């Protein structure tokens, strides 16, 4: 359900603004989106796993908060993030 270290490094590399950037909202949203996608596929086979579903809702909420922050700071970055990660709003 969690992403591997290699996959996480790849996500960071593709979304980082500069080398060593792991804390920018873009990188955090990308990592959360990857984890959400993994959990979503998990629920296709494990429908009754409600403990993990609660974790999924927490991840979605955290991602939503980060997206709200980006929207408040820069609308263009926000729209680019939504488009890049196929997030519905």
UniProtKB/Swiss-Prot annotation:
One of its GO terms (molecular function) is structural constituent of ribosome. Residues 1-11 have a biased composition (Basic and acidic residues). The keyword Protease does not apply. Signal peptide: none annotated. GO terms for cellular component: cytosolic small ribosomal subunit. Keywords: Ribonucleoprotein, Ribosomal protein, RNA-binding, rRNA-binding. One of its GO terms (biological process) is translation. Residues 1-24 are annotated as: Disordered. It comes from the Bacteria. InterPro entries: Ribosomal_uS15, Ribosomal_uS15_bac-type, uS15_NS1_RNA-bd_sf. It holds the Pfam family Ribosomal_S15. The keyword rRNA-binding applies. CDD domains: Ribosomal_S15p_S13e. Belongs to the universal ribosomal protein uS15 family. Part of the 30S ribosomal subunit. Forms a bridge to the 50S subunit in the 70S ribosome, contacting the 23S rRNA. One of the primary rRNA binding proteins, it binds directly to 16S rRNA where it helps nucleate assembly of the platform of the 30S subunit by binding and bridging several RNA helices of the 16S rRNA. Forms an intersubunit bridge (bridge B4) with the 23S rRNA of the 50S subunit in the ribosome. This is Small ribosomal subunit protein uS15. It comes from Rhodopseudomonas palustris (strain BisB18). The gene is rpsO.
């Amino acid at each position: 359900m969690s992403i591997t270290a290699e996959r996480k490094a790849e996500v960071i590399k593709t979304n980082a603004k500069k080398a060593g950037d792991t804390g920018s909202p873009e990188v955090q949203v990308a990592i959360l989106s990857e984890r959400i996608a993994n959990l979503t596929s998990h629920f296709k086979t494990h429908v009754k796993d409600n403990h993990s579903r609660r974790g999924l809702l927490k991840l979605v909420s955290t991602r939503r908060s980060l997206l709200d922050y980006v929207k408040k700071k820069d609308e263009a970055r926000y729209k680019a993030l939504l488009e890049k990660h196929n997030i519905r709003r």
